[in-house]
Design a protein with these regions (language model features):
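Loop-to-transmembrane boundary segments
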Residues: 10-23, 144-167
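N-terminal topogenic module of multi-pass integral membrane proteins
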Residues: 1-70
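C-terminal transmembrane-bundle signature of multipass membrane proteins
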Residues: 160-230
Length: 230
């Protein structure tokens, strides 16, 4: 009777390992593109482009942090291929975005496209939240997934739309008044707003993880006990 239970635990661990490995690899690739393109603007003559490098770093930190949080709260057997395909698509978006450091017009256009890719990822992941709610009957799991579901909806209905609109507004502003933003260098205010928004979001993710930490441990223990009883 214990063999199937042991197999489920082993498969859960295997899927978690795959997820963490994929996250590390694709964000490592994104970091390579960021550093490779950052070296072309890191001079005093291009100091106005430095915030774009910081914004890129914040994007990587946010994606990695959210991915790890997602893995620790939701990932179990079976492996979710579409979810991982979304991750790869997001990494491609990051790589393309980082090639446009030093080009504010293209940066904000691609930032808008990137937000449009990440936005439906949160909607898709609601399926995984519902799946975990069904196979996790404990009290800790119920509280954990109530918080996770609330966070998913907050991202779908508020945080991602706000980020999308911020980037879209910045892109349209540059297209409407290129001399004001590009020639006169006022694009630094737009990238400054993006950096602040990304920094605030990263702080939110870190604090949210702190709230979930004890519930993640308790839920994993409940999963283990459920597996042992089967």
């Amino acid at each position: 009777m214990k063999a199937p239970s042991a197999s489920r635990s082993e498969l859960d661990a295997l899927v978690v390992g795959i997820e963490l490995t994929l996250t590390s690899i694709i964000q490592g690739v994104a970091l390579y593109f960021l550093t490779d393109n950052a070296r072309t603007v890191l001079s005093l003559r291009q100091i106005g482009n430095w915030p774009y490098v910081l914004a890129g770093l914040l994007i990587i930190l946010i994606f990695w942090s959210r991915s790890v949080l997602h893995t620790l709260t939701l990932i179990r057997w079976p492996l979710e291929f579409p979810h991982n395909f979304f991750y790869i698509g997001c990494a491609l978006g990051e790589a393309l975005l980082f090639t446009r450091i030093g080009s504010p017009r293209a940066w904000f256009a691609l930032s808008t496209a990137y937000a449009a890719i990440v936005w439906p990822l949160f909607a898709y992941d609601l399926r995984m939240v519902r799946a975990r709610e069904k196979d996790s009957a404990g009290d800790a799991a119920s509280r954990l997934y109530a918080l996770v579901a609330h966070d998913q909806w907050a991202n779908i209905g508020l945080l991602m739309p706000a980020l999308f609109l911020l980037n879209l507004t910045s892109a349209l502003s540059i297209y409407a008044r290129p001399h004001f933003f590009l020639v006169e260098g006022r694009h630094v205010f737009l990238i400054g707003a993006q950096v602040v928004a990304l920094a605030v979001y990263l702080v939110y993710v870190i604090r949210f993880f702190g709230r979930l930490t004890p519930l993640i441990l308790a839920t994993r223990q409940e999963w283990h006990m459920e597996t042992e009883r089967r």
